[in-house]
């Protein structure tokens, strides 16, 4: 039967279900809106959309690496109980795989992509909400790739392989031996998870972060009652320490504190006989 578009709109307004689901429900119920509402409830779709408005404070981070490209994403749930649910974990890993395949970081665009068997990703998430019984929210996606080099990742305290609460991926561009580069890249990813840098280099650190820290330090040193030129040197010294805390290239490497990350890269370049460039990294921490 042909379904009235106004009936679809009314049913969608009442239930929050998608256009396709509303059309199917009305078709199955011969256009009867009340019966269609019942149909959607029975199918769990209306329930899923209702739950999709609930707050989410837990979840999982997943990574998927394939040679010179990789993806990381964060999917939130309401509780840790669901985060440890096998069905939820499978969904998150599948989404990471698809993010790496599609190489799409925009959530809205990604949700429209095919999941499997003509089902899009958004519909699959809604289906899981209905079955699992908690809201599930795809929070963010990060994708990296290099033409020559590797992308590697690390998950801290994984629940299963490539799945946990904190993770990072990093892209290294180089023409050196791939296997040796992978080992180094994984060490960098582990370092990123441990130190949680705010930026790759000083040049890309948010100016607002710099200005805020400088203002805090300035207020601290004003009480020292020293000449302005001396105070400026003190401020510069403390800012240098701050950069060493928040800028990846300025940080002391956790596995060898004799070197900063920048110095370690130069050392590795000599060792492996090729230039190495950290193109970018992505660090995801649940609800941060």
Swiss-Prot record:
HAMAP family: EF_Ts. Residues 79-82 are annotated as: Involved in Mg(2+) ion dislocation from EF-Tu. The keyword Cytoplasm applies. The lineage of its organism: Bacteria, Pseudomonadati, Pseudomonadota, Alphaproteobacteria, Rickettsiales. InterPro entries: EF-Ts_dimer_sf (IPR036402), Transl_elong_EFTs/EF1B (IPR001816), Transl_elong_EFTs/EF1B_dimer (IPR014039), Transl_elong_Ts_CS (IPR018101), UBA-like_sf (IPR009060). Belongs to the EF-Ts family. This is Elongation factor Ts. GO terms for molecular function: translation elongation factor activity. Keywords: Cytoplasm, Elongation factor, Protein biosynthesis. It comes from the Bacteria. Its main location: cytoplasm. NCBIfam families: tsf.
């Amino acid at each position: 039967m042909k379904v009235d578009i106004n009936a679809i709109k009314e049913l969608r307004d009442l239930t929050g279900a998608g256009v396709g689901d509303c059309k199917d429900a009305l078709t199955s119920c011969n256009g009867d809106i009340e019966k269609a509402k019942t149909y959607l409830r029975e199918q769990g779709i209306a329930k899923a959309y209702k739950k999709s408005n609930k707050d989410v404070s837990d979840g999982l981070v997943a990574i998927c690496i394939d040679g010179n490209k990789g993806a990381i994403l964060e999917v939130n749930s309401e509780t840790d109980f669901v985060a440890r649910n096998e069905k939820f974990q499978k969904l998150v890993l599948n989404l990471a795989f698809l993010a790496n395949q599609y190489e799409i970081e925009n959530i809205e665009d990604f949700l429209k992509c095919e999941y499997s068997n003509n089902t899009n990703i958004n519909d699959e998430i809604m289906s899981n909400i209905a079955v699992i019984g908690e809201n599930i929210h795809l929070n963010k996606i990060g994708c990296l790739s290099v033409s020559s080099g590797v992308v590697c990742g690390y998950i801290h305290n994984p629940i299963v392989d490539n799945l946990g609460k904190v993770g990072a991926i990093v892209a290294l561009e180089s023409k050196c031996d791939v296997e040796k580069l992978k080992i180094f890249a994984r060490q960098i990813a582990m370092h990123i998870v441990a130190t949680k840098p705010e930026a790759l280099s000083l040049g890309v650190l948010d100016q607002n972060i710099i200005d805020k820290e400088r203002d805090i330090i300035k207020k601290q040193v004003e009480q020292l009652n020293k000449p302005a030129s001396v105070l400026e040197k003190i401020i510069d010294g403390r800012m240098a320490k701050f950069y060493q805390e928040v800028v990846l290239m300025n940080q002391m490497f956790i596995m060898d504190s004799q070197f900063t990350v920048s110095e370690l890269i130069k050392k590795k370049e000599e060792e492996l006989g090729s230039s190495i460039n950290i193109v970018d990294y992505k660090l995801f921490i649940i609800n941060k």
